Regions:
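Active-site anion/phosphate-binding pocket segments in diverse small-molecule metabolic enzymes
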Residues: 1-16, 67, 86, 93, ...
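Active-site-proximal beta-alpha core segment in soluble small-molecule metabolic enzymes
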Residues: 2-17, 27-199, 212
Length: 371
């Protein structure tokens, strides 16, 4: 039972509509890999995966074997790619649960092959090309050839794809992205023609059609937060709501919260909400962020506490005890987007969506699929 109103509300219909919009812009020949790592960017991995499937996604991307296993155990049968580097201990699960594994070293192929022999099954892999991100992947044609050589010696391990990741597709200068694209294309030429090639993250999906290849990998865009300007009708899929638990008046000269960083210059009405950095509401929002009350923006006063935050409701008569407060999302004609909340907090929309802690339960709208 929840004894205070403080929850995230995920609109699964928004997820479906966003996936349809992305899929529709790509055309029938380009698949959509729904990136659902990190609990679907804080939206709930399994429910989002089901909604994405309903809307036309055909593949899933996760970061770890544990995430892939969770999808399998909840009945997701579509291909799942693990983006992270394979460790020897992860080979058993990759084969057992039929998870496609990213590879970039010959020893990874050998680990999977050993598990194929033990389990009497095949393993599937995608080759990662480090074209400029600087994380994992082969960097040269020679390194890619070493992977192909290892695959020839391990017939149970099947190469089904190759991919790269752009470091700055949302940046103003396109030269580096195009350089990465050329590196990927050069290495791809020695790979079998039948495999899936994919490179486009959300930004590249929206800005660089030449990067679409056989499949695109929308992550943040699927959740309604496009990282670049677009005419595509993408809408945020999550709201974070709470309520006012106390209202008081303060006089000129009164201070608010720890460190007394806010001092009133006049008579004010101040509301307290039961949310703080212990819930994942960024402390950097202190004296900077705003919430929505009665459809209007109410500035945060003083420091965000661990469990409570105070806001200025002087000019908002609807601000009474029990009134809804929106930390993220729309209320009336106004909206606080993940990008806006991130800007106030000095961070990015991704972190905003992932920030809420276990004290902030999640509920869902439009779970029923309405075609």
């Amino acid at each position: 039972m929840q004894y205070r109103k403080n929850q995230r509300v995920v609109d699964l219909q928004a997820i479906r509509e966003n996936v349809r919009a992305l899929k529709g812009a790509m055309g029938e020949s380009v698949q959509v890999m729904a990136v659902v790592k990190a609990d679907a960017y804080g939206h709930g991995m399994v429910k989002v995966a089901r909604a994405a499937l309903q809307a036309g996604a055909t593949y899933f991307g996760v970061a770890t074997p544990d995430e892939g296993i969770q999808l399998r155990e909840d009945g997701i049968k579509a291909p799942i790619l693990i983006f992270g580097a394979l460790g020897k201990d992860g080979a058993e699960a990759a084969v057992r649960y039929e998870l496609t594994q990213t590879v970039c070293r010959a020893e990874m192929i050998e680990w999977l092959y050993e598990e194929c022999r033990l389990q009497g099954k095949e393993a599937f892999v995608h080759l990662k090309v480090d074209s400029g991100m600087g994380r994992i992947g082969v960097r040269t044609v020679e390194e890619a050839q070493s992977i192909l050589n290892a695959l020839k010696k391990c017939p149970g391990v099947k190469l089904t794809g190759a991919f790269t990741h752009f470091a700055d597709a949302d940046g103003e200068m396109e030269a580096f992205t195009l350089k990465q694209l050329k590196i990927f294309e050069d290495i791809s030429r020695i790979l079998p023609g039948s495999i899936l090639r994919h490179a486009a993250n959300s930004a590249a999906t929206l800005r660089y059609p030449q990067t679409h290849f056989d499949m695109v990998r929308p992550g943040i865009a699927m959740y309604g937060c496009p990282p670049v300007k677009t005419v595509m009708p993408l809408r945020p899929a999550q709201r974070w709501v709470t309520e006012i638990v106390h209202v008081k008046k303060i006089e000129s000269g009164d201070t608010v919260s720890y460190g007394r960083t806010f001092t009133s210059q006049h008579l004010m009405r101040v509301a307290t909400i039961p949310v703080g950095y212990g819930d994942g509401y960024h402390r950097m929002l202190s004296n900077r962020g705003k919430v929505l009350v009665g459809g209007r923006l109410a500035p945060i006063l003083g420091r965000v506490c661990m469990d409570q935050t105070m806001v200025d409701v002087t000019d908002i008569p609807e601000a009474v005890i029990g009134a809804e407060v929106v930390l993220l999302g729309r209320q009336g004609e106004n909206e606080i987007t993940p990008d806006q909340l991130g800007a106030w907090a000095g961070t990015i929309s991704y972190e905003v969506l992932l920030a809420p802690t276990m004290r902030v339960p999640r509920s869902y709208e439009h779970e029923e699929y309405d075609q």
